[in-house]
């Protein structure tokens, strides 16, 4: 119940250097910038990407080329312009490559987390809500086998269903957070000089955001676990329609076992806030370690331009990866309980994750969060909370592989252009 991408990575929105304002060249006198501080008044960084993993609690990326002295673990910075004519051309070429690399790295990260990982998310959720299952799929080997069976019997759509609704949930979450923060004094970001009151208000904003997005998250969950065998061809906005219908009590008829939204608020907000806190702490901790390691390596020996550019992007990507992995693993049992509560009473038909074919109904009768936890522990054991965990292993293995491949491609491009 959280944006898959926490706030902070502004790779897609990175701008370096100056822009050519040709349309206004004749109306205003030319300005000369003698120092990096003069340039800082005119060259600014754009806002962070909505939905990105900015878990720095108020940190913003500095303008390109402007040295930063507040962080002791940063490496040496480069001046944006050179005095010589040939150096200026080379600097512009390096700047264009740097901007292209930032866009490519950000795009690869977005693609991995929201597209490439979606089949793993689909199977993981189906295993979590399947209380009938005898095979828990705790290892990636059984998960790959069942993925192949689903693809063979139902086609590729069986593993990519509901992807559009996940983007809608992210959009609703971001929009709700922005609107609430605009009309209330609740801070959207926490500054370095924080106070307990500011932290509490920030977490309250997150909680209200999760409450607003909760019915749409429930509708998206149904789309991702509903069997493709009996699935109708629904539009991309079906998630919005079902979410609104869930709030006003209209739409698809549900059974009497459907839990009211009020009883789902606590587990939904608990999972979302804990996921955000764990991700924030781990991301901050890992990023601090990586920056300190980079700073020490710069002091020990001279660093190549290729390594310097890699150090500008990849520490934050690695920190985001570690934060997302740890929070998903730690909160996996709570996520299983949350999904079972959301799916109960919706008359959803899921695929049989034991056989790879046939379908199964969801007929649980949990009275609430505590009853769900006790029932899973008694009937399925402790490992019942970890059904489908092998899909998480596959998901983050793919993510790590894409990060490594992106780093290799980026290093090759830099070596050929420097």
Curated annotation (Swiss-Prot):
UniProt xrefs under Gene3D superfamilies: Mitochondrial carrier domain
The keyword Protein transport is annotated on this UniProt entry: no
A GO CC term attached to the entry: mitochondrial outer membrane
One of the GO BP terms on file: optic nerve development
UniProt GO MF annotations: protein-containing complex binding
InterPro entries, per database record: Mitochondrial_sb/sol_carrier, Mt_carrier_dom_sf, SLC25A46
Residues carrying Phosphothreonine: 45
Region Disordered, residue ranges: 1-30, 44-93
Pfam families membership: Mito_carr
Modified residues (Phosphoserine): 32
Outcome, altering residue 249 to D: In HMSN6B; uncertain significance; no effect on protein abundance
Localization: Mitochondrion outer membrane
First and last residues of every Solcar repeat: 96-187, 311-413
Phosphoprotein recorded as keyword: yes
Domain of life of the source: Eukaryota
Topology in the lipid bilayer: Multi-pass membrane protein
Impact upon substituting residue 138 to R: In HMSN6B; uncertain significance
Membrane-spanning residues: 103-123, 167-187, 202-222, 258-278, 314-334, 382-402
Keywords: Charcot-Marie-Tooth disease, Disease variant, Membrane, Mitochondrion, Mitochondrion outer membrane, Neurodegeneration, Neuropathy, Phosphoprotein, Repeat, Transmembrane, Transmembrane helix, Transport
Signal peptide from the UniProt entry: none
Impact when changing residue 333 to L: In HMSN6B; decreased protein abundance
Disease tied to this entry: Neuropathy, hereditary motor and sensory, 6B, with optic atrophy: An autosomal recessive neurologic disorder characterized by early-onset optic atrophy, progressive visual loss, and peripheral sensorimotor neuropathy manifesting as axonal Charcot-Marie-Tooth disease, with variable age at onset and severity. Charcot-Marie-Tooth disease is a disorder of the peripheral nervous system, characterized by progressive weakness and atrophy, initially of the peroneal muscles and later of the distal muscles of the arms. Pontocerebellar hypoplasia 1E: A form of pontocerebellar hypoplasia, a disorder characterized by structural defects of the pons and cerebellum, evident upon brain imaging. PCH1E is an autosomal recessive form characterized by severe hypotonia and respiratory insufficiency apparent soon after birth. Additional features may include optic atrophy, peripheral neuropathy, dysmorphic features, congenital contracture or foot deformities, and seizures. Death occurs in the first days or weeks of life.
Function: Transmembrane protein of the mitochondrial outer membrane that controls mitochondrial organization. May regulate the assembly of the MICOS (mitochondrial contact site and cristae organizing system) complex which is essential to the biogenesis and dynamics of mitochondrial cristae, the inwards folds of the inner mitochondrial membrane. Through its interaction with the EMC (endoplasmic reticulum membrane protein complex), could regulate mitochondrial lipid homeostasis and thereby mitochondrial fission.
Family: Belongs to the mitochondrial carrier (TC 2.A.29) family.
Subunit details: Associates with the mitochondrial contact site and cristae organizing system (MICOS) complex. May associate with the endoplasmic reticulum membrane protein complex (EMC).
Protein name per Swiss-Prot or TrEMBL: Mitochondrial outer membrane protein SLC25A46
Gene, per the UniProt record: SLC25A46
